């Protein structure tokens, strides 16, 4: 099966300013069909230059975001939860404005906030309630929320495929699906391909990310296993390359694991084509 492939622009840095827009043409030139853009700014006017260039190039677009402690959607403080909900609704609005249909990320709870214990049922209930509030708004904008699990060093609420699958089933909303990221699966799953097949009916979006967070095919992720799982899950969505620069503190990338961003973008695309047998 032929898949459409997108590149996440975080490879160029965390601030989606106009200096990063210039790289969109190269992403298109390499062969990518779309881009995935992080939403940290919720002023629609900020995104006008992005929309203009995306439309000019004919790229399709997806968005991602995450929450900090001050917007934790499972906080015991209702005001904090509401702040997270309000931010996500604005991110949905930006997503729709850009012409995107998917907003993904680990926003079922906050990034890198820990209680020192496993999640309580109350925390899971708060997550469900928060996601339902955002999902209703997303539905009105024709946007799907793709929830992502993170590895246990970045999140304690959902840190494996089965936990996220259970949460999405509990939320039970047509605009809430799973976004599967191979980086976290490489750490947490016994068999990534089998995990993909097991949760296939709820997977709507897939990120391909190497163990080094750099060039696909140059780390320890078992890509043969990943693409075997992909071939068995009847997935018809997109494949998105996610790689990070040391400029993104939240990713804890303290050294550069690639030569240049341009080479990373190109080699990752070429390696995906090899794995797909294209």
Regions found by a protein language model. Give the residues of each.
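N-terminal pre-domain/capping segments
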Residues: 1-100, 173, 201, 255-278
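Conserved beta-strand positions in the central sheet of alpha/beta enzyme cores
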Residues: 36, 63-65, 104, 146, ...
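Active-site acidic/histidine proton-transfer and metal-coordination neighborhood
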Residues: 18, 56, 79-177, 259-262
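Catalytic-core regions built around general acid/base machinery
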Residues: 47-58, 130-138, 195-198, 225-230
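Histidine-acidic metal/acid-base catalytic patches
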Residues: 1-13, 17-28, 158-180, 185-278
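Acidic-residue sensor for enzyme active/binding pockets
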Residues: 36, 148, 154, 189, ...
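A short acidic, helix-capping loop that chelates divalent metal ions and anchors anionic groups
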Residues: 70-75, 111-117, 153-154, 187, ...
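Active-site-proximal loop/turn and secondary-structure-junction residues that shape catalytic pockets
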Residues: 11-13, 39-41, 67-70, 107-111, ...
């Amino acid at each position: 099966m032929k898949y459409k492939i997108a590149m996440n622009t975080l490879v160029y840095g965390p601030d989606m300013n106009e200096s990063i827009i210039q790289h969109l043409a190269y992403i298109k030139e390499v062969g990518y069909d779309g881009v995935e853009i992080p939403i940290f700014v919720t002023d629609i006017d900020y995104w006008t230059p992005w929309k203009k260039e995306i439309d000019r190039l004919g790229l399709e677009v997806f968005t991602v975001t995450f929450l900090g402690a001050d917007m934790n959607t499972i906080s015991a403080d209702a005001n904090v939860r509401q702040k997270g909900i309000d931010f996500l609704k604005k991110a949905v609005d930006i997503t729709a404005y850009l012409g995107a249909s998917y907003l993904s990320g680990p926003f079922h709870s906050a990034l890198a906030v820990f209680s020192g214990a496993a999640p309580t049922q109350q925390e899971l209930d708060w997550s469900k309630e928060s996601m339902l509030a955002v999902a209703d708004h997303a539905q009105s904008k024709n946007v799907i929320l793709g929830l992502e699990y993170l590895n246990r060093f970045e999140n304690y609420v959902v840190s494996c495929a089965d936990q996220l699958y259970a949460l999405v089933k509990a939320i039970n909303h047509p605009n809430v699906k799973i976004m599967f990221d191979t980086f976290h699966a490489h750490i947490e799953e016994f068999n990534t391909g089998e995990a993909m097949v097991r949760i296939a009916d709820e997977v709507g979006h897939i990120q391909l990310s190497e163990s080094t967070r750099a060039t696909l095919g140059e780390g320890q992720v078992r890509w043969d296993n990943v693409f075997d799982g992909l071939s068995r899950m009847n997935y018809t969505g997109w494949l998105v390359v996610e790689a990070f620069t040391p400029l993104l503190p939240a990713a804890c990338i303290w050294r550069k694991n690639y030569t240049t961003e341009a080479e990373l973008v190109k080699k990752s695309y070429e390696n995906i084509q090899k794995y797909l047998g294209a």
